[in-house]
């Protein structure tokens, strides 16, 4: 079962997520900016007996990355981000100064670049990336979390969203069948693992409940934002939960039907 703890962080009320299944664990968009916020994270980690294996960034605006450097130093873990965020990362100090907020310590040496369609597999104390065109098995992983990278620029130049589901190592009797149908069922997902349906979308500042991300900041692009939402997000299964970087959770179906920023493309209400 995927478990998620949400933390409201910093003066922007950014939402950071601790995500785990069994002993597989990651942190998404760690905006922790005070001792109280870090204490809340450490309490949740200790109570659940887990250790983060990586940090996933939807984008690199200050409110989403305040805690990255400290957490990387504490656990020695990598940071996954889209290479398009090099522009945002290069402007971090200026953005912090303009906002009048605390500065962000450099964490560039920890970054592992990801691209659209890549999959990040997380097991206990381990995380690795399978590129979109790679197949084959992942050795040493018996199960955990799988994230699929969806490139959704527009709020920033390298913004992404993450689909999330569990995976487990198939039994010996299942492996041959999985080898045959894994690509058909799961695209480029590794063949010797059996995965669940996608359960959750972490949408960062691309899609919110009843709203969309702003595109008037440096690196923003309204056309790209809308294209990403329509071609990458709204086509997903309607039952997928959407956990954004700010505000309440929603679902793909809710946003298809009710989001006023997506008119006149809303679906009709279902009776």
Report the location of each language-model feature.
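Active-site HxH/HxHxD metal-binding segment of metal-dependent hydrolases
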Residues: 33-36, 42-136, 143-145, 168, ...
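Short acidic/glycine-enriched loop/turn segments that link adjacent beta-strands
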Residues: 11-13, 114, 155-158
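Conserved Rossmann-like nucleotide-binding pocket used by diverse enzymes
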Residues: 3, 56, 148
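A secondary-structure boundary/capping signal
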Residues: 8, 58, 82, 203-204
